[in-house]
Every structure is written in structure tokens, then in C-alpha cells.
Amino acid sequence: MSTAARNESQNHELSFESRSHPSELLPRLRPFYSTSLGAAYLGDSREMLAALPDGSVNLAFTSPPYALHFKKEYGNVHKDDYVEWFLSFAREVYRALADDGSFVLNIGGSYNKGLPTRSTYHLKTLIALVDEVGFHLAQETFWYNPAKMPMPAEWGTV
């Protein structure tokens, strides 16, 4: 079974290129969700990426654990170790990503412990993705989350 990947030509007409369906690339794994256009898998992305052939992924979308000051049950890395920790994962994404593929990364900022200043770990991570892995930064998006204060309350002006 194949699926069609959309590519736009210079005159903005759509052309379709045949690509393998994820179920053909990961025959031993059962998709969490699947359509004729693709599939989503639930699991440890580091293990799943290792099973994928080079250049076989059109979209990698992830929200890894943030470098927080307190430990979460799912595990998180200290900001001083974050860049190297994340780059090992990002190199696998880069290997598996198709030449025309996209990598969407949701990475949150944090404040320096005990100070009214922001950490730069997320900026260092983005720079390392470009300089050390080979990604191209295409766009940054900032989203509004009304559920949480964006900083420790004592440092905010309300």
C-alpha cells in the first residue's frame, strides 16, 4: 500500500509522489492511529526512530520534557545537560527525515532558579540543532497558554 505525499510545483499545481505507508516501514509495530495517508505510533520515540529507514519520515512532531528545576515522574534533564541529551535524539530525527520533511519542536523556556531571569537552554538547543546537526530554522511560533502563569508570580507585573 502506498500513500501520496503532496509537493507543490513552481506554478503552484499539486503533484503527487508515491511514498511508503508507515505500516510498510514498521511492520512489527501496530499504529496507535492510522489512515490511508499515514499513521501515528505511540511509544518511546528513541526506539521507534531507530527502526526507521533513512529519509523515510515526512513529519517529526515532538514536545520533549522541558529542563525544569524539579523532577517530573516522566523524567527530565537539568538545563546544563539538556542540549547534549536532546541532540542524541535530534540526530536520529535528522537521519530518518526525508529531504523535504519537517521537524516541529515544542520546547519551553524556563527561569533561572531563584532569579528573575530566563534560562537560555532552549535557545542553545535551537542553535545546536542548526550548527551541530544540520537543521534549518524556518520559523518560531509562540503560543498563549492561559492555564499557567508564564513566570514565578513574584516576578510578574499584573
PLM features per residue range, with description:
Residues M1-V158:
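Core catalytic lobe of class I
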